């Protein structure tokens, strides 16, 4: 799985770019503010329908332009496909696959599985539970065909239930929502638990390479007491939920906790160690997908050198090479990525939104 070509139009500070990409490493080098992160973000947006630095389309469309357009050629298991995405300032989104309109962003996500590592990615470890739920849900989305529909339906029903809690006085008035919510909640929790169990060995092995000095443990918390029946719990907690005006327990409150030597990692590890752990989690998840489905992730690394010393950068470079996946790396200078440069790599110089291929010695 690799992008062989990327066309960018009116995205961030990039007016127009047409990039022939390497199947291995693609380095984006340039000073801060040059647009190298914008290239990473264009790749990410092509596979997610949204940018990773802003959820508002208007903020990623180039100044005074009506829309951005992204187009890519994908080499997927000896089959080439074309994918395209455009979004207007009004939020209108168009997805094209192999020249036909009417496709969903979820189809792009299936075609282009990606792992993103950014300086802001520490939220996976020290942010709220929603970031760790997203980690599990990425895996469930790519491993369970029914997950996306089930999770979308559950979110819709929970939103309706929360709105109803502001208007009802008796539990019987919202029982109809709960009868739909309960089987979805149980199924989603089963998928998450199964995925966290399945990937645990991969995470442990990768973390042992990156952080051998710590004994790491992982636990999935489904969002309600494991000894309780979810339906009975919703009924018992009705008065509390009504006072709060939201549903306080369920899969939307799940978490995936990580401890080092029995202590939450965010309380014990340095920033450099947290970044290594974040990288280990992303790599383990990508490699697990490859082993399960034969598909390789695209890895996107923004500001590669931040928080990592030379030895840790070299270790990460070796692990990324071992995946044989396509990798996009941004850095201020070529020296920061010297350990990653190889025959299958390509270097791009980015300045003021202009992108040029650089010859490699």
Swiss-Prot record:
The entry's keywords: ATP-binding, Cytoplasm, DNA damage, DNA repair, DNA replication, DNA-binding, Nucleotide-binding, SOS response
Chief localisation class: cytoplasm
Entry's Gene Ontology cellular component terms: cytoplasm
GO BP terms: DNA replication; DNA synthesis involved in DNA repair; double-strand break repair; SOS response
Residues reported in the UniProt entry to bind ATP: 30-37
GO molecular function: ATP binding; single-stranded DNA binding
InterPro entries tied to this protein: DNA-binding_RecF, DNA-binding_RecF_CS, P-loop_NTPase, RecF/RecN/SMC_N, RecF_2
Cellular localisation: Cytoplasm
Gene3D superfamilies referenced in this protein's UniProt entry, alphabetically: P-loop containing nucleotide triphosphate hydrolases (3.40.50.300), RecF/RecN/SMC, N-terminal domain (1.20.1050.90)
Similarity comment text for this entry: Belongs to the RecF family.
Record's function text: The RecF protein is involved in DNA metabolism; it is required for DNA replication and normal SOS inducibility. RecF binds preferentially to single-stranded, linear DNA. It also seems to bind ATP.
PANTHER family, A to Z: DNA REPLICATION AND REPAIR PROTEIN RECF (PTHR32182:SF0)
Protein name according to UniProt: DNA replication and repair protein RecF
Species this protein is from: Yersinia pseudotuberculosis serotype O:1b (strain IP 31758)
């Amino acid at each position: 799985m690799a992008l062989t070509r990327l066309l960018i139009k009116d995205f961030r500070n990039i007016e127009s770019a047409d990039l022939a990409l390497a199947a291995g490493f693609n380095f984006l080098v340039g000073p801060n503010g040059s647009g190298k992160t914008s290239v990473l973000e264009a790749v990410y947006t092509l596979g997610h329908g949204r940018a990773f630095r802003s959820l508002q389309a208007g903020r990623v469309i180039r100044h005074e332009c009506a829309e951005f357009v992204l187009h890519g050629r994908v080499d997927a298991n000896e089959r080439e496909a074309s994918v395209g995405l455009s979004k207007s300032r009004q939020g209108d989104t168009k997805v094209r696959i192999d020249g036909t309109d009417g496709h969903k962003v979820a189809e792009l996500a299936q075609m282009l599985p990606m792992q993103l590592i950014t300086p802001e990615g520490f939220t996976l470890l020290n942010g709220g539970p929603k970031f760790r739920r997203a980690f599990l849900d990425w895996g469930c989305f790519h491993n369970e065909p029914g997950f996306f529909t089930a999770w979308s339906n559950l979110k819709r029903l929970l939103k309706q239930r929360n709105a109803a809690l502001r208007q009802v006085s008796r539990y019987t008035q919202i029982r109809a929502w709960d009868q739909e919510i309960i089987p979805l909640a149980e199924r989603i929790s089963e998928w998450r638990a199964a995925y966290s169990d399945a990937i645990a060995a991969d995470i442990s092995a990768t973390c042992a390479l990156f952080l051998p000095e710590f004994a790491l443990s992982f636990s999935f918390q489904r969002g309600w007491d494991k000894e309780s029946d979810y339906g009975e719990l919703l009924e018992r907690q009705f008065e509390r939920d009504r006072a709060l005006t939201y549903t306080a327990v369920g899969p939307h409150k799940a978490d995936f906790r990580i401890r080092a030597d029995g202590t939450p990692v965010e309380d014990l590890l340095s920033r450099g160690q947290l970044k290594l752990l974040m990288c280990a989690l992303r790599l383990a998840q990508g490699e697990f997908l490859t082993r399960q489905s034969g598909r390789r992730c695209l890895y996107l690394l923004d500001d590669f050198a931040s928080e990592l010393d030379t030895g840790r950068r070299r270790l990460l470079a070796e692990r990324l090479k071992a995946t044989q996946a396509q990798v996009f790396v941004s850095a201020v200078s070529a020296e920061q990525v010297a350990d990653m440069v190889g025959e299958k790599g390509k270097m791009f110089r980015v300045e003021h939104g202009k992108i040029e291929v650089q010859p490699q010695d």
